[in-house]
Amino acid sequence: MAVVRVRAIVALLCLVAALGLAEPLEEEDGVLVLRAANFEQALAAHRHLLVEFYAPWCGHCKALAPEYAKAAAQLKAEGSEIRLAKVDATEEAELAQQFGVRGYPTIKFFRNGDKAAPREYTAGREADDIVSWLKKRTGPAATTLTDAAAAETLVDSSEVVVIGFFKDVTSDAAKEFLLAAESVDDIPFGISSSADVFSKYQLSQDGVVLFKKFDEGRNNFEGDLTKDNLLNFIKSNQLPLVIEFTEQTAPKIFGGEIKTHILLFLPKSVSDYEGKLDNFKTAAGNFKGKILFIFIDSDHSDNQRILEFFGLKKEECPAVRLITLEEEMTKYKPESDDLTADKIKEFCNKFLEGKIKPHLMSQDLPEDWDKQPVKVLVGKNFEEVAFDENKNVFVEFYAPWCGHCKQLAPIWDKLGETYRDHENIVIAKMDSTANEVEAVKIHSFPTLKFFPAGSGRNVIDYNGERTLEGFKKFLESGGQDGAAADDDLEDLETDEETDLEEGDDDEQKIQKDEL
């Protein structure tokens, strides 16, 4: 027994010594700086820990940094036990891999030291969004408001706040309200039975009000008070009628449930800027909850890639485009360049009625498109060349800015030279940022597809080595050696997206934000 006691005492002393020797966690602007060596220490020390995995070169991360620090300072000032931390994922690759980091920034919330299932951060990238989300995750679904002062403080605390007014907070309606509150991550909720609170906000009976610091200022819920109806009400009213696309608003835009977006590309420098924006807002009021109206400053350098994605040039703006962000992104273009409220409403109504065909971009066909070993495809000649029943056509779908495409270019040119005079093999390429075709949807770059001869309109994805020998084996085998099996296609797409995220951050924007 004595030996056992001695060992226990020694173990305890070692533990105490280890804890005593643990270095204080480094901080930058109130944010903990974590590495693999101190990650466990941070989890043990803080019950609620929000961790940003970032890359130093990432533009989105740089934009987030001041807001992230501001959120940390706000929580500290309030005496909160919640801490914010960050990990340089380019330096701590194993740590990033452990938590499934594939893009930047990735933000995860750890509770009670649990590494097994951290929660993905899903709200916006402004300090208020971060603080609001964390309070929702660590506190009650709705704050109990005992008096008018408490209600006013809550309403002033965030851009959007939802308050339930219930004389009996145990009623069925109040329970439905709380269920809705638990389902919404990024909006603070309050609940009150106080006559003082009812009076302040001019309510004489039970109800729900969404308060916001824009547009109408408040929306009163009407109808049968159920969780689903409340969530639909919130979805329809939580965003401005027109929201400007920025680094900060992107998560709200793409993280929401409204997947149909109409975009106004408008330079802020144009003389009638306010008038055109007002027309857009007037039209927006007719489609709340159905179509999200987004304004993009076409003069801003950060938005040039988005213009390219829609096949627009700065001199063509103002312009309107519509996009659906379902499994396949589909773009639509109005028939008229008229940007009056009536024309915009007409365009949206026709879309909702299914009366508009998708808009497919195409460059003009170069006169010498077939004069080089690698043939140039555009939207206008794609069908004719790729689905030629007498030819086997191997196509690279690329983006001019893609680093992996640039690395592939000399190999693809050599492949073109190799089969330059072949009677039925054609090597081709298409700039998929400027050309779209109905038969093929491209999600990452480069994408390589083989269109074998015959009448079947077959398409084979290439998943082999990107070497001259690998390509030759694939072609000589009739598209068999190196072809992606059906169950490999998802992995192939995942790998490509990972490649994209390793490149310049602006290159990621289209893939991550889907614009």
Swiss-Prot record:
<dbReference type="GO" id="GO:0009897">
    <property type="term" value="C:external side of plasma membrane"/>
</dbReference>
<feature type="site" description="Lowers pKa of C-terminal Cys of second active site">
    <location>
        <position position="466"/>
    </location>
</feature>
<keyword id="KW-0256">Endoplasmic reticulum</keyword>
<protein>
    <recommendedName>
        <fullName>Protein disulfide-isomerase</fullName>
        <ecNumber>5.3.4.1</ecNumber>
    </recommendedName>
</protein>
<dbReference type="InterPro" id="IPR017937">
    <property type="entry name" value="Thioredoxin_CS"/>
</dbReference>
<dbReference type="GO" id="GO:0006457">
    <property type="term" value="P:protein folding"/>
</dbReference>
<dbReference type="Pfam" id="PF13848">
    <property type="entry name" value="Thioredoxin_6"/>
</dbReference>
<feature type="site" description="Lowers pKa of C-terminal Cys of first active site">
    <location>
        <position position="125"/>
    </location>
</feature>
<feature type="site" description="Contributes to redox potential value">
    <location>
        <position position="60"/>
    </location>
</feature>
<feature type="signal peptide">
    <location>
        <begin position="1"/>
        <end position="22"/>
    </location>
</feature>
<feature type="domain" description="Thioredoxin 1">
    <location>
        <begin position="23"/>
        <end position="139"/>
    </location>
</feature>
<feature type="disulfide bond" description="Redox-active">
    <location>
        <begin position="402"/>
        <end position="405"/>
    </location>
</feature>
<feature type="short sequence motif" description="Prevents secretion from ER">
    <location>
        <begin position="512"/>
        <end position="515"/>
    </location>
</feature>
<feature type="active site" description="Nucleophile">
    <location>
        <position position="61"/>
    </location>
</feature>
<dbReference type="Pfam" id="PF00085">
    <property type="entry name" value="Thioredoxin"/>
</dbReference>
<dbReference type="InterPro" id="IPR013766">
    <property type="entry name" value="Thioredoxin_domain"/>
</dbReference>
<feature type="disulfide bond" description="Redox-active">
    <location>
        <begin position="58"/>
        <end position="61"/>
    </location>
</feature>
<dbReference type="GO" id="GO:0005783">
    <property type="term" value="C:endoplasmic reticulum"/>
</dbReference>
<dbReference type="InterPro" id="IPR005788">
    <property type="entry name" value="PDI_thioredoxin-like_dom"/>
</dbReference>
<feature type="site" description="Contributes to redox potential value">
    <location>
        <position position="403"/>
    </location>
</feature>
<feature type="compositionally biased region" description="Acidic residues">
    <location>
        <begin position="484"/>
        <end position="507"/>
    </location>
</feature>
<keyword id="KW-0143">Chaperone</keyword>
<feature type="domain" description="Thioredoxin 2">
    <location>
        <begin position="351"/>
        <end position="480"/>
    </location>
</feature>
<feature type="active site" description="Nucleophile">
    <location>
        <position position="405"/>
    </location>
</feature>
<dbReference type="InterPro" id="IPR036249">
    <property type="entry name" value="Thioredoxin-like_sf"/>
</dbReference>
<feature type="site" description="Contributes to redox potential value">
    <location>
        <position position="404"/>
    </location>
</feature>
<dbReference type="GO" id="GO:0005788">
    <property type="term" value="C:endoplasmic reticulum lumen"/>
</dbReference>
<comment type="subunit">
    <text>Heterodimer; heterodimerizes with the protein microsomal triglyceride transfer MTTP. Homodimer. Monomers and homotetramers may also occur. Also constitutes the structural subunit of prolyl 4-hydroxylase. Stabilizes this enzyme and retains it in the ER without contributing to the catalytic activity. Binds UBQLN1.</text>
</comment>
<keyword id="KW-0413">Isomerase</keyword>
<feature type="site" description="Contributes to redox potential value">
    <location>
        <position position="59"/>
    </location>
</feature>
<keyword id="KW-1003">Cell membrane</keyword>
<dbReference type="GO" id="GO:0003756">
    <property type="term" value="F:protein disulfide isomerase activity"/>
</dbReference>
<keyword id="KW-0732">Signal</keyword>
<comment type="similarity">
    <text>Belongs to the protein disulfide isomerase family.</text>
</comment>
<keyword id="KW-0472">Membrane</keyword>
<dbReference type="GO" id="GO:0034976">
    <property type="term" value="P:response to endoplasmic reticulum stress"/>
</dbReference>
<comment type="function">
    <text>This multifunctional protein catalyzes the formation, breakage and rearrangement of disulfide bonds. At the cell surface, seems to act as a reductase that cleaves disulfide bonds of proteins attached to the cell. May therefore cause structural modifications of exofacial proteins. Inside the cell, seems to form/rearrange disulfide bonds of nascent proteins. At high concentrations, functions as a chaperone that inhibits aggregation of misfolded proteins. At low concentrations, facilitates aggregation (anti-chaperone activity).</text>
</comment>
<feature type="active site" description="Nucleophile">
    <location>
        <position position="402"/>
    </location>
</feature>
<feature type="region of interest" description="Disordered">
    <location>
        <begin position="477"/>
        <end position="515"/>
    </location>
</feature>
<dbReference type="InterPro" id="IPR005792">
    <property type="entry name" value="Prot_disulphide_isomerase"/>
</dbReference>
<keyword id="KW-0676">Redox-active center</keyword>
<keyword id="KW-1015">Disulfide bond</keyword>
